[in-house]
UniProtKB/Swiss-Prot annotation:
Annotated CDD domains: AdoMet_MTases
Biological source species: Pseudomonas putida (strain ATCC 700007 / DSM 6899 / JCM 31910 / BCRC 17059 / LMG 24140 / F1)
Protein name per the record: Ribosomal RNA small subunit methyltransferase C
Residues of the signal peptide: none
Underlying gene: rsmC
Assigned EC number: 2.1.1.172
Length: 332
């Protein structure tokens, strides 16, 4: 069980009524708290929770409409996302309890200071390198529309400026990361057809593909609901059409793809997690058509080339700069 869940269950008597668990991990916490419901924005966690606790988990960027008497937020990595979620929960809990649980290395002590905007926070427990905080909502805020927190910026690309809309919690929020910047220089000569932007984030790569290859069908895929929402906003801001879907890794992707383009993720919260990226590389041949291509950027220290060669039988390094490599491989 997640150590944060274990800390929560040390105070289980506080959580016996209708409770919303925001950012709920995919463990047995719902099984221990029979009146609780989960809210998650991670498609993989949603699939696991729904399979074990059918009808008790909500997926998306908005809180579920069902009533709850108290709520607990599992602290996310992003400070901006934490602020949005705390505000959203507090807006529905006037005079009631809001809890915050998180790891010390994830910044729980600093994040707990945000609770002071709603009342007088107090620390209830500290164990398993985690802390549990509580506040009674004396001053319920107005709920903020998610789009009001969007960061909008413009990228100067070869074929003209691209408008990007990023949301709290999305990778490289409000800026272009160095890996994607390098990959944007290597989008020439791609095979047309059905293109996939895997781990799309704010949709920079997918939007660029659709503009450069307008006759191709472009699908953008991410595990995170906030990334899916941001990608849709980015496409709309540029007058582009594309399919944006949520799913847990490459298994959720279409088949017969002409291209897989990616700056694959390797973090889950504050933890390093290479599973999604390694699955992408190992299973790429299942999703590419014959002659289809995979082109991706990754940190130079990651040993991805042998995995790509094992899956597709070939791999070349197109470029290397600023600690990143561009890999290219074709399904024979």
């Amino acid at each position: 069980m997640d150590p944060r869940s274990e800390v929560l269950l040390r105070q289980a008597e506080l959580f016996q009524g209708p409770l919303l668990i925001a950012g709920a991990p995919a463990d047995d916490l719902l099984g221990q708290l029979p009146q609780a419901q989960a809210w998650t924005w991670h498609a993989g966690d949603q699939a696991m929770l729904e399979s074990r606790f059918a009808g008790r988990s909500h997926y998306g960027v908005e809180a579920p409409e069902a009533a709850f008497e108290s709520a607990v937020l599992f602290l996310p990595k992003s400070r901006e996302l934490a602020a949005y979620l705390l505000n959203t929960l507090a807006s529905r809990l006037a005079g009631r309890e809001l809890y915050l649980v998180g790891e010390k290395r994830g910044g729980i002590e600093g994040a707990a200071k945000q609770l002071a905007a709603f009342g007088k926070p107090r620390k209830l427990d500290s164990a398993r390198h985690c802390q549990l905080w509580q506040v009674t909502i004396d001053q319920a805020p107005q709920a903020k529309p998610l789009e009001s927190l969007a960061e909008r910026f413009e990228l100067a690309l070869e074929d003209g400026p691209l408008q990007v809309v990023s949301l709290p919690g999305v990778f490289s929020h409000g800026r272009l990361d160095r890996g994607t910047a390098l990959l944007l220089k290597h989008l020439d000569g791609l095979p047309g057809g059905h293109m996939l932007d895997f781990g799309c984030g704010a949709g920079v790569l997918g939007a660029t593909l659709k503009r450069r290859y307008p006759q191709s069908r472009v699908t953008l895929l991410d595990v995170d609901a906030f990334a899916v929402a941001a990608s849709r906003l980015t496409l709309a801001a540029n007058g582009l059409e594309g399919e944006v879907i949520s799913g847990d890794g490459i298994d959720a992707a279409p088949t017969e793809l002409s291209l897989i383009l990616s700056n694959p993720p390797f973090h889950t919260g504050v933890h390093t997690n290479y599973q999604a990226s390694e699955n992408l590389l190992k299973k790429s041949a299942v999703h590419l058509r014959k002659g289809g291509e995979m082109r991706l950027v990754a940190n130079s220290f990651l040993r991805y080339q042998p995995l790509i060669e094992g899956a597709l039988g070939n791999c070349q390094v197109r470029d290397e700069a600023d600690g990143f490599r561009i890999y290219q491989a074709t399904r024979g």
